[in-house]
Amino acid sequence: MQPVELAEALASFDEVFAPRIVGYYNGNKIQVAKAHGEFVWHSHADTDDLFLVLKGRLIIELRDGVVELGPGQLCVVPRGVEHRPRADEETHILLIEPVGEPNTGDSSERAAAPEVELET
């Protein structure tokens, strides 16, 4: 068992909205991702969506409002709530989702990213 260096993990790729798995916890994948620009509107029917900002600012647009997050802040979007993450600058985030859950909530969505593990 070794600690995971999140900054090193994030430095190992450039793609945005393409999470990388850095570990597993009770059937969930722990992921890091970079955000810049707008992601697609989506929801997750069977699971909540957790966003923890490590660096930068993340804006989570909801149909009835906006949540703005800075470093060290997190937000849990409840299952079934439509949302769209966006970032006006490169932002680093940590995500926790069940294994097999697409980042778009729907694997047929063209923006759905494959599950990619980083070597830790």
How does the language model describe each region?
Residues 34-35, 43-62:
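Short, conserved beta-strand element in jelly-roll/cupin
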Residues 63-79:
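Short acidic-glycine-tyrosine-enriched beta hairpin
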Residues 2-10, 23, 88-120:
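Double-stranded beta-helix
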Residues 27-29, 36-38, 57-59, 66, ...:
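Short, charged/polar surface micro-motifs in flexible loops or helix N-caps
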Residues 26, 54-55, 70-71, 89:
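A cytosolic small-molecule/anion-sensing beta-strand core signal
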Residues 42, 60-61, 77, 82-88, ...:
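Short beta-strand His + acidic residue motifs that chelate non-heme Fe in jelly-roll/DSBH
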Residues 6-41, 47:
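A short glycine-rich, His/Asp/Glu-containing loop-to-beta-strand
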Residues 62-63, 71, 87, 105:
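Short glycine-/acidic-enriched loop or helix-start segments at secondary-structure transitions
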